[in-house]
């Protein structure tokens, strides 16, 4: 079939297999161009099919020649409807790993469930014995707690009072004021249950108990802080409470990993265009301005540049891993530079529907958004007939 982007609000309902494949190949080529990282050898990536999780899997495999197991929840094509982008990303990753002679297997299912944890542990035991790195990069809006059976839904709301600020419809370039009503206590509890560190802890407990963590194993989860500009809706809102919980969980997990001399870290990453960030009011406008400033400074990074730098300059230097006072790894350091933030704040004051195309990188934002779904990718013929029914090699 010929596949075109179909939009509904902040979601693209279609994805392109060839575009997703080219995206993955581009990321692999970037990692290879940066040279070998003396990194992990056996890696589990929980949330391995898109964004930072996919970038972690690619960096592990093609930067350090690591065997990887990826866990995700994606949909194959059905009756004239393409599969999800993460499905096609994984098809491409598995094919490229096979060509390179690198072990890679994948599990498609609910990572929050006990069954998927057990299936993953069984696969590690059978094929790898143990893993030396566990990346935790889940981005789901809903979680059913396997112990209580309660289904929690996360919300993106401020805490303590309504919040009003500028936002942009990145499809039209219309800049307007948005007001978000505050969260109640239940909203906070649910968001922490979905996006906090409880499930990360459950994964590490299960793996420790099963003996599948190698001595000196590291686990890393991803977080975001961001500037004062976005804090009401992000870091001081419901999602920020979840990130606080995630960051606190790193210390708890590190305590438990002492028996294998392991350590848990949270890496604070930069703001990027993802399906999740596109749905948060205010954030797309902030990112469009940030991109403009960082590109002008020559310090713009996407997911793969961020994670390659995390591995090469932070995790695997052979020296102690540098962290902030809270023990967090900071690869948002370029985004949070004083000059960068001052420039973004100045542009924020000026931005309107009339000048947004000139003073922000809305074009780059849109392009990155379409790229998530395999569209607007260079070297791809979108008029060509494409087979949407492709299977994932190495799916367990």
UniProtKB/Swiss-Prot annotation:
Q: For NAD(+), which residues are the binding ones?
A: 47-52, 73-74, 110-111, 138-139, 243, 272-274
Site features described as Plays an important role in discriminating NADH against NADPH, chain residue numbers: 74
Alphabetical GO biological process terms: fatty acid biosynthetic process
Coiled coil regions in record: none
In terms of superkingdom, the source organism counts as Bacteria
Report the pathway entry: Lipid metabolism; fatty acid biosynthesis
Task: Using the record, list the residue span of the signal peptide; answer none if the entry has no such feature.
Answer: none
Question: Active-site residues?
Answer: 234
What EC number(s) does its UniProt record assign? Answer: 1.3.1.9
**Which UniProt keywords are given for this protein, alphabetically ordered?**
Fatty acid biosynthesis, Fatty acid metabolism, Lipid biosynthesis, Lipid metabolism, NAD, Oxidoreductase
The top EC class is: oxidoreductase
MF (Gene Ontology): enoyl-[acyl-carrier-protein] reductase (NADH) activity; NAD binding; trans-2-enoyl-CoA reductase (NADH) activity
Reaction(s) catalysed (UniProt annotation) = a 2,3-saturated acyl-[ACP] + NAD(+) = a (2E)-enoyl-[ACP] + NADH + H(+)
Q: Which InterPro entries match?
A: Eno_Rdtase_FAD-bd_dom, Enoyl-CoA_Rdtase_cat_dom, FabV-like_NADH_b, Trans-2-enoyl-CoA_reductase
Binding, substrate: 224
Annotated family = Belongs to the TER reductase family.
* Record's subunit section: Monomer.
Which HAMAP family does the protein's record reference?
Answer: FabV_reductase
Chain's role: Involved in the final reduction of the elongation cycle of fatty acid synthesis (FAS II). Catalyzes the reduction of a carbon-carbon double bond in an enoyl moiety that is covalently linked to an acyl carrier protein (ACP).
Indicate what this protein is called per its UniProt record.
Enoyl-[acyl-carrier-protein] reductase [NADH]
Q: Which organism is it from?
A: Cytophaga hutchinsonii (strain ATCC 33406 / DSM 1761 / CIP 103989 / NBRC 15051 / NCIMB 9469 / D465)
Q: Which gene encodes it?
A: fabV
